């Protein structure tokens, strides 16, 4: 498949029934646990490094496939009893922050390994995607989620402060290539690079990082341990003198081949780059400091619930932005299907 890009000038549990008559519900722990459908917990919260905050992992294609094969109720299109709900609900936030109300995305190309070493052109693809995605109908489903509401809230309505989807959410790129990145960077090293990026971009206060995410992208062959076998990417946060800093570990996605999206759904060899990059971006906007934002009762975020769907409602597809054509997965919308919830490629 031929894909078009504009070169820049200079990256579980589901489908239930939600009552449309109520704007919020009691906290989830007080509700009886019900059979979960549509996805499951193959992705979600994991401890990657002792002493570090847990991360939200993006499951691989094969892990998701095996999970769905072993859990008939977790397959797309499954039906569950009307008494259950697998929609996202608010987990209270951290320091009053649960979503990114005016998102800013910074791309960090970490390490001298990037120098003349980008065989798939991932840097340009990511930059073009981030430059064009703000304000798109694909990302707009994040705007139904909010902060400043009670823990356990399912529907914001006009309450709280909603997540944003403004144009121009891409705030800059930093080629941090003066020295090499660790050959297999640990989570603590990735977190430290995110803090360095905050300083580089002048975000040195808690307020300046309150709606910001840093995508730490590593070059080919320079990926963290567990990539392509345990996960495709993950996002987390770290505390610093600049406040809490949200970041994504984005390895060189095409190194994983089909297990992280190459040719997924016939979308081309580079499809996984923006499927995974978009997944992490959408999750960070709605759960900036995991897992205090919007998740379901199984601990899945809006991207986890819709990962690697190949047919039917929510199947991954190409979208057209002003900066090119890019493959994306769908994102979970509580509002879909009159409040029953589901995976959507456009909103409203």
Predicted regions and their residues:
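Positively charged n-region of N-terminal signal peptides that target proteins for export
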Residues: 1-4
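Mobile, glycine-rich extracellular loop/lid and propeptide segments
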Residues: 27, 88, 98-113, 122-127, ...
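Active-site-surrounding "flap" and adjacent substrate/cofactor-binding loops of secreted or lumenal enzymes
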Residues: 104, 113-176, 296-297
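N-terminal zymogen propeptides
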Residues: 20-92, 100, 110, 134-140
